[in-house]
UniProtKB/Swiss-Prot annotation:
Quaternary structure and partners: Forms a heterotetramer with UvrA during the search for lesions. Interacts with UvrC in an incision complex.
GO terms, biological process: nucleotide-excision repair; SOS response
MF term (GO), any: helicase activity
The protein, known as: UvrABC system protein B
Top-level taxon in the UniProt lineage: Bacteria
Bilayer-spanning residue ranges: none
Helicase ATP-binding domain sequence ranges: 23-180
NCBIfam families per UniProt: PRK05298.1, uvrb
Domain Helicase C-terminal: 429-588
Underlying gene: uvrB
Length: 664
């Protein structure tokens, strides 16, 4: 079923890792972990496991950038099978919200990317119709999508010779989300011309031309979407829905009645509580929505009524991509130390935002049920899971029936040497090291604790003739990737930043990583973070890490010991097999789907830092500090280090304010 194509055979630790993981799957192990160091070929190992067990697979990545990279790698490994891409279809997303302290209602505002919509629909079709499928997805895959049973029931089967007339086909197309138009370049549309219907699905590039003779299908052809030339003649075809959420007239009527019932119950509650403003607001808004649903079959924010359309009970999980798979599909959670905390936090973040909308009469309580899955629901809807990371979290390690190590790199590259140097004169020392790197035609990364330090250090390096840029949270995904492209091309010599783990992209030109203030204990200098940062130089033969510190913290000690352990294993392997290490060679263009990444994927799994700062107006200083501290640790656990740093700075500022007021 799966046919893996590669010029390489598994080497190093890959063969034993593949064997153990496949054996674990065949023995029915529910949870396994692949602990693979940077550059050890974890994606190739995953591809081999998929090919060996011949089962559909879902690979979940923590962000769009990494998902795009994985998608391309799997496409190359499986050119004859279906590899699909399923991420949030928003280029820009501002969720609906209400801020009581300002009496400010924010309407939902979003730009939808048609290319991603097409890829999502292609994913749903592939997963429902074949088994040789690998889907690469972001954490958006646990958000609601349409009922898979409706997707199956409402497709249109046509064959040459079928008795159906043009208008009946047009009516059936409209029922599954296609719109009639003359613009043939639009996906999800169809056009009528005499006895011919041309259909442009959202799930494929080719159009479909159906020609009639009276009330009989005379011919079916695939056509080029733009010049409309014939590509292939077909005897039969299945036309799948154009949109994720589809409904029947019967379901619509049932949903409207159910919404009315819930509205009456909620209005009764608000009346008893004496909430007259909320009563009138909810009544007016919901009745307007009902009128639109009855006349147009649609209303703004229709997703907030999804429970009524699906016939779900309050609290029941929504349908998601997971429900489209066969029951035996495998899940790989890539960069699990980041992705698992995201999956855990998304439900709470969504519910906290909707709480005000429901309490203040903007939405019915059923809006809570248009939501992502809880982590427990996610585990119930999945079967066997393989966590993949260079630094798995405690959860993954504790729950896994086996942890498979992949330490040896096929390239022979060893983990970099780690030096600890004093902070006195650290900037001058750093400059000298960067100059050496520059002379070799290589690059450097410098990680610091604050955005301000990153900015000042980058400016200082530039003044000294070193081409430097800094990464910061105001840059969106494309701008961040552009900075890294410049680094790889040699347009800049060094990149300075607070969180250099965010992209997770391969940077083989980087031979030096400098960690400033390495002994300042906290989330930015934890064992996991330090190991991840050290791994940034693991693709270059001259890789070196310098930690500037005046003492060795426990986190530093453990990170250095683990790095040295991995070095020993690789060096012994190289000696035994006569391998000479070589740097990774990778095409200069960092292949990322830029058309998908105009804006950063909305980080919908928690409150934004900005909204947290708004709480200062309604909380006492002590309560506000407690919230800041809690959110800081949550952001750190999810490796959102820039958010965590901003919250930390605000926490320090409030503490200083309190001290001044108390005269301390």
């Amino acid at each position: 079923m799966f046919k893996l194509v590669s010029e390489f055979e598994p080497t190093g630790d890959q063969p034993q890792a593949i064997e153990k993981l496949v054996e674990g799957l065949n023995r029915g192990m529910r949870f396994q972990t692949l602990l693979g160091v940077t550059g050890s070929g974890k994606t190739f190992t995953m591809a081999n496991v998929i090919a060996r067990v011949n089962r559909p697979a879902l690979v979940i990545s923590p962000n769009k950038t990494l998902a795009a990279q994985l998608y391309q790698e799997f496409k190359a490994f499986f050119p004859e099978n279906r590899v699909e891409f399923f991420i949030s279809y928003y280029d820009y997303y501002q969720p609906e919200a209400y801020i009581p302290t300002k009496d400010l209602y924010i309407e939902k505002n979003a730009d939808i990317n048609d290319v991603i919509v097409r890829m999502r629909m292609s994913t749903l079709k592939s997963v429902r119709t074949r088994r040789d499928v690998v889907v690469v997805a972001s954490v958006s895959c646990i958000y609601a999508t349409g009922d898979p049973n409706d997707f199956d029931r409402m497709n249109i089967n046509l064959a040459v010779g079928d008795r159906i007339d043009v208008l009946e086909l047009a009516e059936r197309l409209a029922r599954i989300g296609y719109q009639r138009t003359e613009d043939v370049s639009l996906s999800g549309c169809f056009r009528l011309k005499g006895d011919t219907v041309e259909i442009y699905p959202t799930y494929q590039d080719e159009g479909i031309r159906i020609e009639f003779f009276g009330d009989e299908v005379d011919s079916i052809t695939l056509i080029d979407r733009f010049n409309r030339t014939t590509l292939e003649h077909l005897d039969k075809i299945i036309i799948y829905p154009a949109v994720e959420f589809i409904t029947t007239e019967e379901k619509l009527k049932r949903a409207v009645e159910s919404i009315r019932e819930e509205l009456n119950e909620r209005l009764s509650e608000l009346k008893k509580q004496g909430k007259i403003l909320e009563y009138e607001r909810l009544k007016q808004r919901t009745l307007n929505d009902i009128e639109l649903l009855e006349t147009m079959g649609y209303c703004p924010g229709i997703e907030n009524y999804s429970r009524h359309f699906d016939g779900r009970k309050p609290g029941e999980p929504p349908y998601t991509l997971l429900d489209y798979f066969d029951k035996d599909f495998i899940v790989f959670i890539d960069e699990s130390h980041i992705t698992v905390p995201q999956l855990r936090a998304m439900y709470n973040g969504d519910r906290s935002r909707k709480k005000n909308l429901v309490e203040y009469g903007f939405r019915l309580p059923s809006a809570y049920d248009n939501r992502p899955l809880t982590f427990e629901e996610f585990l119930k809807k999945t079967g066997q899971i393989i966590f993949v990371s260079a630094t798995p979290g405690d959860f993954e390690l504790s729950i896994s029936e086996q942890v498979v190590e992949q330490i040896i790199r096929p390239t022979g590259l060893v983990d970099p040497e780690v030096e600890v140097r004093p902070t006195a004169g650290q900037v001058d020392d750093l400059v000298n090291e960067i100059v050496k790197v520059k002379e070799r035609g290589e690059r450097a990364l410098v990680t610091v604790l604050t955005k301000k330090t990153a900015e000042l250090l980058s400016e200082h390096l530039t003044e000294l003739g070193i081409r430097s840029l800094y990464l910061h949270s105001e840059l969106d995904a494309i701008e961040r990737v552009e900075v890294l492209k410049k680094l790889r091309r040699g347009d800049v010599d060094v990149v300075v930043g607070v969180n250099l783990l965010r992209e997770g992209l391969d940077l083989p030109e980087v031979s030096l990583v400098a960690i400033m203030d390495a002994d300042v204990e906290g989330f930015l200098r934890s064992e996991t973070t330090l190991i991840q940062i050290i791994g940034r130089t693991a693709r270059n033969i001259n890789g070196k890490v310098i930690m500037y510190a005046d003492r060795i913290t426990n986190a530093m000690k453990r990170a250095i010991e683990e790095t040295n352990r991995r070095r020993r294993i690789q060096l012994e392997y190289n000696k035994k097999h006569g391998i000479t290490p070589r740097s990774v060679i990778k095409p200069l263009e960092i292949e990322v789907f830029e058309q998908f990444m105009v804006k950063e994927e909305p980080e919908r799994y928690g409150d934004t830092v900005k909204n947290i700062f708004e709480m200062k107006k309604t909380l006492s200083p002590e309560e506000y500090m407690a919230v800041l501290e809690e959110e800081m640790y949550r952001a750190a656990s999810e490796l959102r280090y820039e958010d965590a740093a901003a919250l930390r700075d605000e926490l320090f500022r409030i503490r200083e304010e309190i001290k001044k007021k108390k005269g301390l």
